[in-house]
Amino acid sequence: MMGMMSQGGSKGPDPASADDPSVQMGRFFPPMEHLSPEEKTEAMERAFERLKTSMDMLAKPDGTQKAPAKNCQALKTNHPSKPSGNYWIDPNGMDAKDAIMAYCDMQTGATCIQPKPAMSHEITIMSDDKEAWVGEIDTNAFDINYKADSNQMNFLQLASSSAEQTITFHCKDTVAHLNRANNKRHAVSLMAWNDLEIKHRGKARYQVLSDECQHKKRSWAQTVFKVQSRKPARLPIVDVQVQDFGRSNQAFKIEVGQVCFS
């Protein structure tokens, strides 16, 4: 190997060099023909350390942009001492260039993707329609997006066994779940990633953590919905349907929580 590493006098590239491992190793091992034996030993030790670090990064990616982990559970397994925080992940494992940023809960190993944006503008719908999907209204539409493309999201779903997310409905004189009569005639619906409609009833239903909107106050209040599923393909939420609107004093905003996969 020392003989191969000390060669360097040829002019122009050798057509076979791209397939020669010794040439590729030059990234780690510097030219040594002018070094003393002691300097060669030191250079070799440093080069082997760089090579070892590089191999470790391939075997156990550390969540940096150059070495994204498959997901946060893999990062937790390989680097259990890392704190919770933002890390780079590459669920499809194809190329670090399409890696995405995720929040890793290092206590649970959950991988959380952030919405983009997290809060809608204030929306008032002046229409005689009985229901409306917020992403499809003629004016003031709000598109729910996330900081991950569909390909990475799908691979993340495939590698997970459960997912959860919260949606907070900020309301002004607008019902979100129960109304004053204590029925759910105007309850919102949520559109899942896989086009399943998640409602207050049925097999695919949401939880209601709090419901201030029932009182139809003219000041801002909020209702918090939570979706938990052992079918990760359902999340994240991509649209919200409202049913209580049509007056100028009614308004709402939608706050989209991060979606977490485990």
Language model feature labels by segment:
Residues 1-262:
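Mature extracellular or lumenal effector domains of secreted proteins
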